[in-house]
Amino acid sequence: MKKTPFVTKQQVEEIVKKFPTPFHLYDEAGIRANAQAVKDAFAWNPGFREYFAVKATPNPYLLKILKDYDMGCDCSSYTELMLAKSCGFDGEHIMFSSNDTPAEEFAYADKLGAIINLDDFTHIDFLEETIGHIPETISCRYNPGGVFTLSNGIMDNPGDSKYGMTKEQLFEAFKILKSKGAKYFGVHAFLASNTVTNEYYPQLAKELFELVVELKNETGCDIKFVNLSGGVGVAYKPDQIPNDISVIGAGVHKVYDEVLVPAGMGDVAIYTEMGRFMMAPYGCLVTKAIHEKHIYKEYIGVDACAANLMRPAVYGSYHHITVLGKEDAPCDHTYDVVGSLCENCDKFAIDRQLPKIDMGDYLVIHDTGAHGFSMGYNYNGRLRSAEILLESNGEAKLIRRAETPADYFATFDCFDDIKITE
């Protein structure tokens, strides 16, 4: 199985006439088709809503595309709340899931009418002291501890995670929140990251559904929603079988009917926060080969670096690479594909089998639509690249310009004795 880019060499050659490489490119048609598929997969649940994890791809043009499908925003910081507000999201279309949260962020989330998802038991008093009340609708994050497993083995270790409340804390939190005026409750949990299996959401849903039945019976709280959070992953490697959201939705539906409906809780809404699944496959980093080096290994130097995509350098993550125009050429050369940072980990690929790469070739680094641009940084004085939307009509639209040296030095503009010029 091979990955096929959503953009052709001919299209890139036209785009670079206006916008030089490197740049992050997004596929509007793919984003829209996937958003509709998610809605269709959970259409059986009238209250369903996907809250896109803004941290994954914080671009207003992309958020507004998702808004067309009545999706919300999952925010975890003041600036993400600002971005959501500026795109027209408000009230219960914003989920504020934060941890170690400053008071001003709780206050701003409350001002916007966002649903606040409390990460810790001690945040109850902190929130009340900060905003002067407990919201009528409130959510709490649950951490079951231990190890979360599926049929294909260990998936993750919640017991080693800093997030969420224990079961005992969760039950006590609901009782206290109810006594302080909360009327509608939600439960949130995130137990594994980037799962490439259709089992994850159904298994998580089963655990949370059984939990909220117990919560309602013991506390009398009105459970309004169960938030399955994120964790539904994408197939970064060509030999992986992608998740099927329709199968996942049907699996959640099955356990919903088995657990919640018999308990008289058939009106509970399902929420999700799928940043990676919503965007990763529909973005790529386009870069150009500018150097080759032949020492103990064969190196191809490109004009992008880890500052544009940090996942391979920091996490050792695999991102597939296509050499545009050579999709059908034999992969008979072994390269390290590297950037220009003064760090030896600045490598997009190590010992990767690729077609012969010539200087000036354009490379597509796949699946960067989530946690790609958003995790960029300025180490080594490198500047963040542009973001471009490949619109459904085939036109390329600039949706964020590339940084300039003036942007890099902008935070010195308050000092009269510091002037940095070429």
Please give the residue ranges for each predicted region.
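Charged (often Lys/Glu-rich) extended helix/loop segments that serve as interaction or gating elements
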Residues: 260, 265-422
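Flexible loop/turn segments at secondary-structure boundaries
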Residues: 58-61, 125, 147-148, 193-197, ...
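Active-site loop/helix belt of alpha/beta enzymes
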Residues: 144-291, 354
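Conserved, mostly hydrophobic/aromatic
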Residues: 31, 55, 77, 109, ...
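Glycine-rich, aromatic-flanked loop segments that form ligand/cofactor-binding clefts
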Residues: 132-147
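A charged N-terminal "starter" segment
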Residues: 1-136, 175-179, 183, 217, ...
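Structured core elements
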Residues: 72, 95, 115-117, 139-141, ...
